[in-house]
């Protein structure tokens, strides 16, 4: 793990394919050690700040449990718990927290915010999610894919992302494919494709690593032979209702359902989702969607697929913690370098 100590974790393309693989290997080892009761605390005495300008269940729990497992202490600064960007500039916040903490996680808005924190904090800064990138999620996804196809290299796997691919998930998937050589297919209406410049950059890198990146509106063509089908929510609670109708009309044909799974022609195809998922009407938003748009069987994914044997979303959710732990150990522990 040489080269990781005191390094930031802001986006995947900051790393080489070898570095990404070493992080995944460390995550697998830390997971195995925890399961067998052999985990060694390498972050004892470390203090970690968790800045959340956007709430999250999985990201917060993953960072907190990972830190506690490794002997570190955390301070949670929620959306109303800090003055970042309001009464105190990001630059000043970084310099203050950097004097008190050994590492800082940021989950919130623009990528420029986490980049500024990294520039001025003087300690490792980790991107828990920005509008542009979600690198910790992709680490968990890659580990999950390795676990479910242990005999295959990434450049022998086909990953399909169906839905709105112009968000942080789409961008980070492009970066992951660039580094691993995945056969990545973004199956989405053209209005939901990522920025062309990032696609071009990542496609060239992916091809160097034995992979390919395809963007298509054709569901049947896009999912053929897939090993994994991935999706994410179409709408968020904070968005205007007018956006809901527009987004659902745009994406309805890209719902992950039993037909899409069958179109892969692969009886072993697995389903991935970064969660939370609107697969039923058991949530406030899910219920509203069902009532207003007739999506009673699920929105971006049907309940049938979500609850099927093909669904590995909870393996994926657990792996958030193990991979985040690997990032913290690699960047904060001299014992691991």
Swiss-Prot record:
EC number: 2.1.3.3
Biological process (GO), any one: citrulline biosynthetic process
Binding-site list for L-ornithine: 168, 232, 236-237
Single Gene Ontology MF annotation: amino acid binding
InterPro entries assigned to the protein according to its UniProt record, in alphabetical order: Asp/Orn_carbamoyltranf_P-bd (IPR006132), Asp/Orn_carbamoylTrfase (IPR006130), Asp/Orn_carbamoylTrfase_sf (IPR036901), Asp_carbamoyltransf_Asp/Orn-bd (IPR006131), Orn/put_carbamltrans (IPR002292), OTCase_ArgI (IPR024904)
Enzyme class of the recorded protein, top EC level: transferase
GO cellular component annotations of the record: cytoplasm
Highest taxon, organism lineage: Bacteria
Record's catalysed reaction(s): carbamoyl phosphate + L-ornithine = L-citrulline + phosphate + H(+)
Amino acids binding carbamoyl phosphate: 56-59, 83, 107, 134-137, 274-275, 320
Pathway assignment: Amino-acid biosynthesis; L-arginine biosynthesis; L-arginine from L-ornithine and carbamoyl phosphate: step 1/3
Keywords: Amino-acid biosynthesis, Arginine biosynthesis, Cytoplasm, Transferase
Database matches in Pfam families: OTCace, OTCace_N
Protein's cellular compartments: Cytoplasm
Known role: Reversibly catalyzes the transfer of the carbamoyl group from carbamoyl phosphate (CP) to the N(epsilon) atom of ornithine (ORN) to produce L-citrulline.
Family assignment from sequence similarity: Belongs to the aspartate/ornithine carbamoyltransferase superfamily. OTCase family.
Protein name: Ornithine carbamoyltransferase
Lineage: Bacteria, Pseudomonadati, Pseudomonadota, Gammaproteobacteria, Enterobacterales
């Amino acid at each position: 793990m040489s080269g990781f100590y005191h390094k930031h974790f802001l986006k995947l393309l900051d790393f080489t394919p070898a570095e990404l693989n070493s992080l995944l290997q460390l995550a697998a080892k830390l997971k195995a050690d925890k399961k067998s009761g052999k985990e060694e605390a390498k972050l004892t005495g470390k203090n970690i700040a968790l800045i959340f300008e956007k709430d999250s269940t999985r990201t917060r729990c993953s960072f907190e449990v990972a830190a506690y497992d490794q002997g570190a202490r955390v301070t949670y600064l929620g959306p109303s718990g800090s003055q970042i960007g309001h009464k105190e500039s990001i630059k000043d916040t970084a310099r203050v927290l950097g004097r008190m903490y050994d590492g800082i996680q940021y989950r919130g808005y623009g990528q420029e915010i986490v980049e500024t924190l990294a520039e001025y904090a003087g300690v490792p800064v980790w991107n828990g999610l920005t509008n542009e990138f979600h690198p910790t999620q992709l680490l968990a996804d890659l580990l999950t894919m390795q676990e479910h196809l242990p005999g295959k290299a990434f450049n022998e796997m086909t990953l399909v992302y169906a839905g709105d691919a112009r968000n942080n998930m789409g961008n980070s998937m492009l970066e992951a494919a660039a580094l691993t050589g995945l056969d990545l297919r973004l199956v989405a209406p053209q209005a939901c494709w990522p920025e062309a410049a990032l696609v071009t950059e990542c496609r060239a890198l992916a091809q160097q690593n034995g992979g390919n990146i395809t963007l298509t509106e054709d569901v049947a063509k896009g999912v053929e032979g897939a090993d994994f089908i991935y999706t994410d929510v179409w709408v968020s609670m904070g968005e205007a209702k007018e956006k809901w109708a527009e987004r659902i009309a745009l994406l309805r044909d890209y719902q992950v359902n039993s037909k899409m799974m069958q179109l892969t022609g692969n009886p072993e195809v697995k389903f991935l989702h970064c969660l939370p998922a609107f697969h039923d009407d058991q949530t406030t938003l899910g219920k509203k969607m069902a009532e207003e748009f007739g999506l009673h069987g699920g929105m971006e994914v049907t309940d049938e697929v979500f609850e099927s044997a093909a669904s590995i979303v909870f393996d994926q959710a657990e792996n958030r913690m193990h991979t985040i732990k690997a990032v913290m150990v690699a960047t904060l522990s001299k014992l691991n370098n």
